[in-house]
Regions:
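Intrinsic-disorder-associated, low-complexity terminal segments enriched in Asp/Asn/His/Tyr and depleted
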Residues: 4-7, 16
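Short secondary-structure boundary/capping segments
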Residues: 120, 228, 290-294
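Thiamine diphosphate
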Residues: 148-150, 154-268
Length: 319
């Protein structure tokens, strides 16, 4: 993990279908404070393998979806939900009072998020089999009107997640809630102007309980990001907008991801929002999907899915 050179030294860290949907539980009393998990790196790596199997099986079963970015972000989301974030699936409600919140801005990578939500206890794992099916709560882009626990915003219309995250972080500040807000964005998504309006706003309002992460895989649906719309010096850009910038070049190494998230947490509360620029590999874990943008939004066929599943250990049991 690299600290952007101009940064000061960091401080020391001291039912499946619509008829089965029920409204989110509204808590009438303050829940017990949520706590982060004590899962080991080995535990998290085993979960990653199963989540990647889920991604392949979901997109193959639906014959559509976005496997590439989902596979690349697996370590980040597994680390967040199974180790870092303070959250309690049994106390789910839309407010998330006294819990850390997460917003997925690049909603097309819903397969990895749905798998992580299910495997961490937000809804039954077997519901993953309904991905993109008619009347399923697990549509290609997450929505709130389906009533899926864990989902607090409809996403996939790119560029909006940072704005929502800022609003949630400011609400926590106003409510005296010291929990954090996390957001995830694609690097291609940074071509949306709303991202930079939000980035300027977050710094201007000193939203220092917010940790944004950019999935910096260098690829998007039409090709390499640098060929479609170059981002230039991305760390310098975020720095210029007033953010505390961390660069992690090994976004598919669980230990490095955990270290980056821990460092980011240690920098919160210091007057600036924090961004992690996380270098990942699209299609990580499946040999023929890596190193190309072509699996951004293409589902594997029967033969391709079988080949992928041979490379991914079943560790928690397939749905």
């Amino acid at each position: 993990m690299k600290r952007y050179p101009q940064d000061p030294a960091p401080p020391k860290a001291s039912g499946y279908f619509r008829e089965r949907i029920t409204p989110p539980r509204m808590l009438m009393t303050k829940p017990a404070p949520a706590k982060a998990s004590s899962a080991s790196t080995e535990d998290l790596q085993r979960i990653c393998s199963q989540v990647r199997r889920d991604i392949i099986r979901m997109t193959h079963g639906a014959a559509s979806g976005h496997p590439g970015g989902s596979l690349g972000c697996t370590e980040y989301l597994v680390a967040l939900y199974f180790k870092v974030m303070a959250h309690d699936p049994s106390a789910w409600d839309m407010d998330g009072r006294d819990q850390d919140l997460f917003f997925l801005s690049n909603g097309h990578i819903s397969p990895v998020w749905y798998s992580v939500l299910a495997r961490s206890g937000y809804f039954p794992v077997k519901e993953l089999a309904t991905f993109r099916k008619l009347d399923s709560r697990l549509q290609g882009h997450p929505t709130t009107h389906e009533g899926l626990p864990g989902v607090r915003m409809a996403s996939g219309s790119l560029g909006q997640g940072l704005s929502v995250g800022i609003g949630a972080a400011l609400a926590k500040r106003l409510n005296g809630d010291d929990r954090l807000v996390y957001t995830l964005h694609g690097d291609g998504e940074l071509q949306e102007g709303q991202v930079w309006e939000a980035a300027m706003s977050a710094a201007g309002h000193r939203v220092d309980n917010l940790i944004a992460t950019v999935d910096w895989n260098g690829r998007q649906i039409d090709g390499d990001v640098d060929d479609v719309m170059p981002l230039g010096d991305l760390p310098a850009k975020w720095k210029a907008f007033g953010w505390d910038v961390l660069v992690e070049d090994h976004g598919n190494d669980m230990d490095r991801v955990l270290a980056a998230l821990a460092e980011a947490k240690s920098r919160t509360g210091k007057g600036r929002p924090v961004v992690i620029l996380l270098r990942t590999e699209m299609g990580q874990g499946v040999d023929y999907m890596m190193g190309t943008h072509k699996w951004h939004g293409v589902a594997p066929n029967d033969e391709q899915a079988a080949r992928a599943l041979e490379q991914l250990e079943e560790t928690l049991g397939d749905y």
